[in-house]
Amino acid sequence: MPDDKFLDDFIDILESVDKPDNNRYVAYYSHCPDRLEFIKSKKVVLAKYGSREFFEAVGDPGQYDKIFIHFLWENMWKFVLSLPSGMRIYWLFWGGDFYSPHEYYRKFLFDAETAKYLEDAQADIQKPEFPPLRLIKRLKKALGIYRIMLLKRKAIGRISYLCHFNRLDFELITSAFPTKAKLLPFFYPPLYNFEKYNFESEDSDLKDRCFSQGVKTILLGNSGFPTGNHLDALQKLKPLIGKYNFRVLCPLGYGDPAYIQYLIQKADGILKDRFVPLTEFLEKQVYFSLLKHTDIIFMYQNRTQGGSNAAAGLYFGKKVYFKRKNTLYKFFKDNGLEVFDIETYFSGEAGRVFDELPAEVKEKNKRVILELFSTEKAAENIKRMAMS
């Protein structure tokens, strides 16, 4: 598993439904070279993939009944292919792991402004070259991507179970790669545990930055990665200027530092002081308090990303906007939730986007979210994974 903020709750649930100390947890990546930044559990060992410490921490793979892979990215493809034949391997789906490498999925993932930023950023770090040399490098890069995709194809072919709550993503994967994997329902905490937080942030400075009387608030995205298409989202939100008194809260506590810096600069030029970059890491209680008090959630990703943001927004009775191509939009629609597509509501004059949901719709959305992502269902799903 990588070092991430929601894995402690997963570990707590797994330990509660399985035999005590029956599992071994290895974090193969952290932003900090020698410590875990987000995971607090003492059961987790930090050992970078490929290091001696990693293979010592894992030990003989044959001793395990099953192996859970959190975020199946390139290094984990290699690890999967090194495991004994017949090993039960569980892929705990994140979204970004399927759409890797980004170069292969670039046309789908990134809209025009974001794609241009990435191209310009790449050009800035490359030295001027003669056209024939540039062509050779492009061919080498294309060959490298082809080899990576072959590795990915083989690794996905070894997966026994895909653990995820959205069948639409499962169908995308099985249509793109040959695999006999079965779908097991699964979602990460804190998708289900909104009730356990007090939700009242004591950070008065943060409240003052984010909320003011008579000012509507938009929560944009969930992180500082280009897959959020924030640069294109700014253009979508621009027509609101002069029509509404609003503020855009943008979670940027983790992501690509260069992209975050560029985004803040660009947003300042378009939205001025309406843009509030949240570059600090926010504890769960504070973060969900922001979601509770914002007016609308604006998700401009083309893929599954920020599911907990969307689910929390729906639980709190907020309007949540997606692109129609996003499988989260389709998932929520299919389950009877009232969500809105950006293409319809933010076209032309972009009117009535802040209109509050009727009380009965808020109540229905909250009820359905609790049915889909309840504490009991989370434990049931993880127990099924442990026993399967």
Residue ranges and their predicted role:
Residues 5-9, 225-239:
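A conserved mid-protein helix/loop that constitutes part of the nucleotide-sugar donor-binding site
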Residues 66-68, 83-133:
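Active-site proximal beta-strand in glycosyltransferases
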Residues 134-185, 381:
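A short, active-site helix/loop in glycosyltransferases that binds the activated sugar's phosphate group
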Residues 205-228, 248-250, 369-371, 383:
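Conserved donor-binding/catalytic core segment of Leloir-type glycosyltransferases
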Residues 289-302:
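Acidic donor-binding loop of glycosyltransferase active sites
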Residues 368-388:
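C-terminal alpha-helical cap of glycosyltransferases
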